[in-house]
């Protein structure tokens, strides 16, 4: 299955280049709902809520070369508490330097202040009476270095004066997996209740792997789970959990209960994203000005993020959505998946604004800075210039 990321806004040549040569080349700073930017390397003196009922503590997590889930697991171990005691507004990239607000309950400030983990900083600790929930942010500010630009483009003076005010609102490759873009395929199998195929796709099916990992995935495909378990490394924790859980229950669906609930949800979310990206491609041919029958958000046409309670558009957009719906043989009721969650469905803008976009070309490095609303992908912005997905 492709990722359905096909079209561009800009009618220009793409100049290639390398993203994320170093973690510092990709800085992501969360923007809180009130517009406060959680800046890398700086602290904010948040006022404690008074009176405080003792429920929640919020803090800023600054991390380098950690994904959000692994960083959180490390903090859980360091504080000797449980994963369910923590929440966050949104996940962040791994090979990057990022900030994000997190919340917890059942901990003392002193426990957080004592955490010492390489490449992780806990700061801006605040007592709060409010639970931090997924989506409790405006968006993110990005500062991105693009290196190794094709030589013929380095001489163009306009690299320091690039313009972009909106992009196609694709879900980026991160939603599908940078190293192994198969998350949406696993999600489709889960939606279809084909848990055996989901298991083999996630644990087997080598793509670009080499060495022990490639051999381990080949062993999974051949049914030699014990052999695969011996070869998978620490970096394949979730594959190992799935196999061990399968040994325990001899049931492919039960195997997935070994994974964090958020990860199981992400599989189905990725399938929804795959379908949405196809809607962007189909709508591209008609333009993104509002048309009769469109469902608008901020005067921008939206597409269906298909779930069990999807509201379809009318007119041309409605026809696009129903065509994809029928092509995929969708049954909305099947988005209620026992042990995985109820995937409600919503609407999402087909294009999205890019705020405060700036470019600077210096010493053979192009630096782009901009802000995006939550749920939007910086690599879709950089792709407009480089032609690369990530």
UniProtKB/Swiss-Prot annotation:
It holds the Pfam family TruD. Residues 166-353 form the TRUD domain. One of its GO terms (biological process) is tRNA pseudouridine synthesis. Its EC number is 5.4.99.27. It catalyses: uridine(13) in tRNA = pseudouridine(13) in tRNA. The active site is at residue 93. Keywords: Isomerase, tRNA processing. It is an enzyme of class 5 (isomerase). GO terms for molecular function: RNA binding; tRNA pseudouridine(13) synthase activity. InterPro entries: PsdUridine_synth_cat_dom_sf, PsdUridine_synth_TruD, PsdUridine_synth_TruD_insert, TruD_catalytic. Could be responsible for synthesis of pseudouridine from uracil-13 in transfer RNAs. PANTHER family: PSEUDOURIDYLATE SYNTHASE PUS7L, TRNA PSEUDOURIDINE SYNTHASE D. Belongs to the pseudouridine synthase TruD family. This is Probable tRNA pseudouridine synthase D. The gene is truD.
């Amino acid at each position: 299955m492709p990722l359905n990321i096909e079209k561009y806004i800009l009618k220009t040549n793409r100049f290639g280049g390398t993203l994320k040569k170093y973690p510092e080349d990709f800085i992501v700073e969360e923007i809180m709902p009130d517009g406060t930017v959680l800046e890398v390397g700086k602290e904010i003196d948040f006022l404690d809520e008074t009176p405080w009922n003792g429920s929640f503590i919020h803090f800023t997590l600054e991390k380098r070369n950690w994904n959000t889930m692994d960083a959180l697991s490390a903090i859980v171990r360091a504080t000797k508490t449980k994963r369910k005691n923590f929440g966050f507004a949104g996940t962040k990239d791994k090979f990057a330097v990022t900030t994000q607000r997190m919340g917890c309950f059942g901990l003392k400030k002193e426990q957080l202040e004592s955490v010492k983990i390489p490449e992780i900083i806990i700061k801006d600790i605040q007592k709060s009476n409010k639970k931090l929930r997924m989506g409790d942010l405006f968006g993110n500010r990005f500062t991105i270095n693009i290196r190794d630009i094709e030589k013929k483009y380095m001489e163009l003076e306009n690299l320091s004066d690039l313009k972009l005010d909106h992009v196609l609102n694709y879900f980026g490759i991160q939603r599908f997996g940078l190293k192994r873009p198969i998350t949406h395929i696993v999600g489709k199998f889960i939606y279809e209740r084909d848990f055996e195929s989901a298991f083999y796709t996630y644990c087997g099916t080598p793509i670009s792997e080499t060495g022990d990992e490639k051999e381990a995935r080949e062993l999974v495909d051949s049914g030699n789970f014990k052999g695969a378990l011996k070869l998978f490394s620490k970096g394949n924790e979730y594959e190992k959990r799935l196999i061990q859980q399968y040994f325990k229950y001899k049931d492919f669906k039960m195997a997935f209960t070994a994974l964090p609930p958020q990860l199981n949800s992400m599989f189905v979310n990725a399938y929804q994203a795959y379908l949405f990206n196809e809607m962007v491609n189909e709508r591209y041919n008609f333009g993104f000005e509002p048309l009769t029958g469109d469902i608008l958000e901020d005067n921008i046409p939206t597409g269906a993020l298909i779930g069990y309670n999807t509201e379809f558009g009318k007119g041309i957009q409605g026809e696009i959505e129903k065509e994809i719906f029928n092509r995929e043989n969708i049954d909305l009721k099947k988005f209620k998946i026992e042990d995985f969650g109820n995937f409600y469905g919503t609407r999402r803008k087909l294009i999205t604004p890019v705020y405060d976009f700036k470019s600077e070309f210096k010493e053979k490095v192009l630096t782009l800075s901009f802000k995006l609303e939550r749920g939007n992908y910086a690599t879709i912005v950089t792709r407009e210039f480089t032609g690369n997905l990530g």
